[in-house]
Regions:
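Generic beta-strand/beta-sheet core signal
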Residues: 12, 80, 105, 131, ...
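Short aromatic/hydrophobic contact patches that present stacked aromatics
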Residues: 8, 100-101, 127-129
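C-terminal core of ALDH-fold dehydrogenases
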Residues: 113-170
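NAD(P)-dependent aldehyde/semialdehyde dehydrogenase
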Residues: 14-17, 24-124
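Short, well-ordered alpha-helix to beta-strand connector turns
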Residues: 6, 99, 147-148
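Hydrophobic packing residues within well-ordered alpha-helices of enzyme cores
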Residues: 19, 23, 138-141
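A general structural signal for short secondary-structure junctions and capping/turn motifs
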Residues: 1, 68-69, 92, 140-144
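Active-site PLP-lysine loop of aminotransferase-like
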Residues: 1-11
Length: 170
C-alpha cells in the first residue's frame, strides 16, 4: 500500500459495530490481541519496518504472520484493533503493508484527538480522510490538523492522489 492508503481507521462508538461489519465485508480480517501483538512484533523490529512485509500481497502477509488458517479466500487486509496512538504506539505510524489499525472513539472530539496524535507521531503534512454527514466536522478537522488535504466521504487511497470526479489534481 502507498502512503495514500488507509493506514488507521477511527470509528465513533455509536457506529463501531456497523463499521466493523463493513470492513469485514470489504475483506478485512479482525485480529485478536495476541495476533495483533504478533503482527506488530514481526512488522517492526528494532523500531524499523520489516522489509519482508512491506508492500507484499496478502498471501505473503498471512503466511509470515501465521494467519493463513484464520483467513478465508475473501481476506484482503488485516485489522488490528488498538487503543494507543502516538509516539508510544508504533502501530499507529506508517505501515506500508496490508493491514490497518482500528480505533474506537467515544465521539467526534475523541476521534479528532486520536487523529492528531497519529499525525503528530508520523504524518504531519499527510492527508486525512473523514466520512461524515456533518460538513462542520471536515472544517474542524482541517483547522486542527497539520495536513495537506482532508478527503471527505471518498476512498482515501484513490482520492488523495487526485481523482477524475473530485476536482483534485493528479
Amino acid at each position: 500500500t502507498s502512503c495514500s492508503s488507509e493506514n488507521s481507521v477511527i470509528v465513533v462508538r455509536s457506529i463501531y459495530k456497523e463499521a466493523l461489519v463493513a470492513l469485514e465485508k470489504a475483506g478485512g480480517l479482525v485480529l485478536d490481541e495476541t495476533e495483533t501483538e504478533r503482527v506488530i512484533n514481526l512488522h517492526w523490529q528494532n523500531g524499523k519496518m520489516n522489509t519482508a512485509l512491506l508492500a507484499q500481497d496478502i498471501d505473503v502477509i498471512l503466511d509470515k504472520t501465521e494467519l493463513t488458517d484464520r483467513a478465508d479466500e475473501n481476506t484482503r487486509f488485516l485489522i488490528l484493533p488498538t487503543v494507543e496512538a502516538g509516539q508510544n504506539a508504533i502501530a499507529s505510524g506508517e505501515k506500508m503493508s496490508q493491514f490497518l489499525t482500528l480505533y474506537q472513539a467515544e465521539d467526534f472530539d475523541h476521534a479528532l484527538n486520536l487523529a492528531i496524535k497519529i499525525q503528530e507521531y508520523q504524518g504531519a503534512g499527510h492527508s486525512l480522510g473523514l466520512h461524515s454527514k456533518n460538513d462542520e466536522r471536515a472544517h474542524q478537522l482541517a483547522m486542527a490538523a497539520r495536513t495537506c488535504r482532508v478527503i471527505v466521504n471518498q476512498a482515501h487511497c484513490f482520492a488523495t492522489g487526485g481523482f477524475f470526479n473530485n476536482g483534485l489534481p493528479f
